[in-house]
Amino acid sequence: GVNGQMITLYDKSSHIPLMWTHLIPATLEGKAMHNVQNAMFAASIAFSMGVSLDSIRQGLRTFDTSFFQAPGRMNVYSEHPFKVILDYGHNAHAVGVMADLAQRLDVGNRRLVVLAAPGDRRDEDVLDIADAVSGKFDIYVLKRDDGLRGRDADEIPNMMAGRLRSNGIADSAIQIIPDE
């Protein structure tokens, strides 16, 4: 379709166009594919429970990813000369989804990512998070999480930096922030 895809419900032989994905605020004009999927699931579940089409459309039109409706989940801040997307991606898949979204967004200059991971993550999970962003940003800012959970203060950021380097990211593109 024009500017996006249509979410369509199928009920037996009925084809019910529901809403263009680019009109759903939580999809960032259809670019946040994970939220397109979430909208599809929510719409189909609501429809199967007998919720009216108008109510489903209203719900999709009015739900966004602001801090007030979804704290820590793809919160977009545009008050600066640049855009910030804050998401508490708690595993490599979630971080990868955000990295993929960043690739689909038009940016004026460069893409920067800030990464942290709690200390209770397995080493391989931390490395997978670094892999999920490798090559998708211009600058990689690594910081420690407040939850060290038995790890040394900069162990996680240093582990991520090592993986980024082994994935071909230049030292000049990697910054470690030891403390805020």
Predicted regions span which residues?
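C-terminal helical cap/extension that packs against the catalytic core
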Residues: A130-E180
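Short, flexible, mixed-charge acidic loops at enzyme active sites
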Residues: S13-H15, I156
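Generic beta-strand/beta-sheet core signal
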Residues: Y10, G89, V114-A116, K143, ...
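Short polybasic amphipathic segments
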Residues: G4-K12
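Nucleotide phosphate-binding/pyrophosphate-handling subdomain across enzymes
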Residues: I16-I139
